[in-house]
Amino acid sequence: MKFDFLLANDGNNIPNKQIKEDKSSPYEFTSNPNKLDPYSNNINNNNNNNNNNKSSIPSSVSLSSISSISSMPISTSLSLSSPSIVISNNNPVLSNEYQQQQQQQQQQQQQQQQQQQQQQQQQQQQQQQQQPVKTVNKKNSKSNKSNANKNNNNINNNNNNYTSMYDNKIQQQLQSIYKQQQQQQQQQYQTQTQTQTQTQTQTQTQTQTQTQTQNSSGGILNINSSINNNLNIYNNTSSNKFKHQHNQQAYNQNLSEINNSRNVTTSSVNANSNINPYPNSNSSINITTTTTTTTNNEILWTTTKPTSSTKHSVILSPPKKIDSYDSPQSSPPRQSSLLISTSSPPSPPLSPIQPTNIVQSSSSSFSSPTYIQQQQQQQQQQQQQQQQQQQQQQQQQQQQQQVETVNNIGNNKSNHTSLTPNLTSLSTKDYPPMYSLNNNNSININNNNNNNNNNNNNNNNNNNNNNNNNNNNNNNNNNNKINNNHFDLNDYQDDNQSSYSSPDITTTHNRYSQQQQQQNNNNQSNYHIDHLNDKSIMKPTKKQIKKQSQPQEKLSKYSEDQIHEESEFLLASILLNLKDSNSTLPINNNNYNNNIGNFNNSTILKNISTTSSDDIGSSNNDYINGSISNEQHQYYSNKYSNQNYVQIDENNNNKNNKNNYVTNNIVNSNTDNYNYYSSHNDFDNNNNNNNNNNNNNNNNNNNNNNNNNNNNNNNNNNNNNNNNNNNNNNNNSSNNNSRNNYNNNSKKRSSSVQISPYPPSKSRI
């Protein structure tokens, strides 16, 4: 319905005294032409341009000319990434209080409204004959002024009547449209839900012509939208007649009341597409809307949101726009529409929605709630199965990773084995193992031609602050253990035998490693280095003894003994090989988590506790605390540099003191005998006096003793490693007897160093 009438008070011809404010009216009036309403689309500017910027502006302008001018730059388009579609959810209705006021005014002013309607019809016919639509020319200004003068008194007397009449018409129209639309939507929603539950294999075709009237700020936008996509905008906004603020508040209030009154808003979608019946209900349709609002060809905002629904949602796929006539179906296109139950938030104000035709792909259909539940149950079952499979795989991987081997410490020299102080790994469940068997079931971790730079199995320890350069990478939780079974070498020595001769630990361990790997393949058991505690695992069988070339007596003695010897030699070699006179020997009384061999952190010994000076003489403290001079050190070093064997504690003083078994064997400066922890030919000089006590397997013909830790010390350039300090000031190449690693500045005589793999509260097995 079109409303054409004259607009009074343009600010030039009518004085301000003629304008009367009606306190009952919700609108406020102003006569200032400079305060332009932001939603009036600069009507005054357009009129001024048409009048060649003269001050004489006609006092009356027809609404048809205003609407034609103001409606052009206002455009609203809704686009989709897939075929375009329109979903309108907002049907603004005025508030109840305002409706009551307007109804009272309507009863009092019915006669005046009829007269004004007749005048408007006559003026509309005259204006259509006299002037064009888009422009206001000088030729028509005289006729417009005459018409304005004729109706000037009526306009001034009934200024509020225009507003009330117009509001009453809009109120009636809004109420009727809202009631009709609500009834239609309820009927369509009921019919569609019934058809979906009964037969989902049939195509639902519904058409609807939706008329929506929005009370936008700055005026009334009457939008008549149909299938033909005709959009007629009528704007009664005059120059500064209404203030934007009050009208915006009224619109927002009405919109909030509508949204609060309805839990679920229903809207229809006009679709022109081919939708084949779906015999299967196992599919769903989702619609994603992208709303783009433009004014004067400028994009104000763009909103993209999926349409949430309580029943189902719609998706149009593929994203390309498909012409309905180009679809592979042979059936002709037919009109169809989808009724969508949405609970999405309302669109922004001042966004008149324009319905467009959509093309729906053949892959879309509806999904039933029962099927959705079935799908959810199936997905949950699949997720549970996947989690179980992942857990099983993780367990298998952990079992495979826990297959460890110790360092190949064979020296390929003679019948005896040089027991290098390479402490085997003591990994726990919290730390992954470091070593595994190769494909040929042989231990090739530390071969000379190993390209993995595993000089001492430190390649996996680069980012670990507790680097165990002597295969102690995973000894963090074994707070009180060096090899889980530290033994006293004196307990295993005969009275007539000064040292313990061991079998070839490499070949023996290879054989047991092969056997244990076969057991892993059969029983999925974990070969862990902690199993060395169990003597039943390490004892050879009769068949294995027959295959072994060495005598049975030596084989029977191998298990804990050799492993424990390694730890003994490691402790002795640590003290012997620290040659840097400027470095200090760290003493950590409380931290049992530091690993032996963690040279990158200068934590060289674990569980180094201080004891009273009664355990060791005061002269021992002088040497341990660094008070010995370099001359004395050079003397003792040269005296014992080429000695391969030194007897261990001839008096056997340590048998009765298990916790302090190393104490009296470190140094005894009262005599010329320095008791080293060693056995027969264990400190093999390799004919060059560069004894890699921790790296006898990684010399690689390199006399520089940097094979132990140089490859993996990422963050510490000043590593107090076992073999990185050969180029000291003394130029002493003898690693066995280098004792210049203590702090000469330390003068403490009240404590001595005690090396114990166990805390004082635990006793050794």
UniProtKB/Swiss-Prot annotation:
Superkingdom of the organism of origin: Eukaryota
UniProt-annotated stretches for the region Disordered: 9-61, 128-164, 265-289, 301-373, 409-526, 540-560, 668-765
Biased composition (Low complexity): 40-61, 143-161, 301-311, 325-344, 353-373, 414-428, 438-485, 495-504, 513-526, 668-745
Protein's name in the database: Putative uncharacterized protein DDB_G0282129
Organism: Dictyostelium discoideum (Social amoeba)
